[in-house]
């Protein structure tokens, strides 16, 4: 929400993946934003050709996407598409809001980089959180906002001066100890095992040719 409020104004249009996270469109509506859906495929991610047409026509004020561990597709955008997305943001000077809430739960080794890794001019705003990897109740996240860092910080300060100090201190100590990385490795193994079991059940119970 902070990222959208920073780079858009009521009446602006934003480009979203289709399908996308179910609550993103209502959020945009509450902010007075119009949404334009961009076709998104599990194998290739958001259509860069379709997005470039929108950008060339100057129809959108921002792009919102989930390149790694997409919700609801569960897939990640190919590396070349990420490079192209970062290049388009720089070329057309349009902010890309990268939702990385699930990115640390990737099963690929090594982990796939964020679009932000290819951002040469600060147009990509990377948003992440510990609510999906540690505890939903923490409600603690972070942003790497590039050229918009100051505006985001000012907006956050006006909205809420700080997060709960005890939670932040405990989380900081957990990160510094190295235990977080161990926790992530266990979590990835657990989820990967659950997916394998689910696929096995689908293979056993569904008609031949069913893909999961």
Predicted stretch roles:
Residues 1-92, 103-121, 191:
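Conserved core of the PLP fold type I
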Residues 16, 97-98:
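Hydrophobic residues in beta-strands of the RecA-like P-loop NTPase core, especially within AAA+ ATPase
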Residues 26, 85-87, 96, 196-197, ...:
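A generic "structured core" feature
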Residues 36, 97, 125-127:
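Hydrophobic/aromatic beta-strand patches that form the interior of the parallel beta-sheet core
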Residues 60-62, 94-95, 125, 140:
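Short, Asp-centered acidic motifs that coordinate Mg2+ and/or phosphate
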Residues 120-189:
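Conserved core segment of the aminotransferase class I/II
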Residues 184-210:
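Conserved PLP-dependent catalytic core of the aminotransferase class-I/II
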């Amino acid at each position: 929400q902070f990222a959208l409020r920073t780079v858009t104004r009521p009446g602006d249009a934003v480009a979203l993946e289709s399908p996308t996270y179910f609550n993103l469109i209502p959020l945009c509506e509450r902010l007075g934003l119009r949404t334009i859906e961009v076709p998104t495929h599990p194998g290739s991610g958001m259509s860069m050709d379709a997005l470039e047409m929108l950008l060339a026509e100057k129809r959108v004020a921002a792009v919102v996407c989930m390149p790694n561990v997409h919700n609801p597709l569960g897939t990640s955008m190919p590396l070349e598409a990420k490079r192209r997305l970062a290049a388009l943001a720089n070329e057309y000077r349009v902010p890309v809001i990268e939702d990385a809430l699930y990115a640390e739960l990737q099963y690929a080794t090594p982990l796939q980089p964020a679009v932000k890794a290819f951002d040469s001019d600060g147009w990509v705003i990377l948003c992440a959180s510990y609510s999906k990897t540690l505890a939903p109740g923490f409600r603690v996240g972070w942003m790497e906002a590039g050229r918009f860092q100051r505006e985001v910080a000012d907006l956050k300060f006006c909205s809420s001066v700080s997060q709960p100090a005890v939670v932040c201190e405990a989380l900081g100590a957990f990160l510094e100890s190295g235990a977080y990385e161990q926790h992530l490795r266990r979590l990835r193994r657990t989820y990967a095992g659950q997916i394998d079991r689910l696929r096995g059940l689908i293979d056993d119970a569904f008609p031949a040719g069913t893909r999961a």
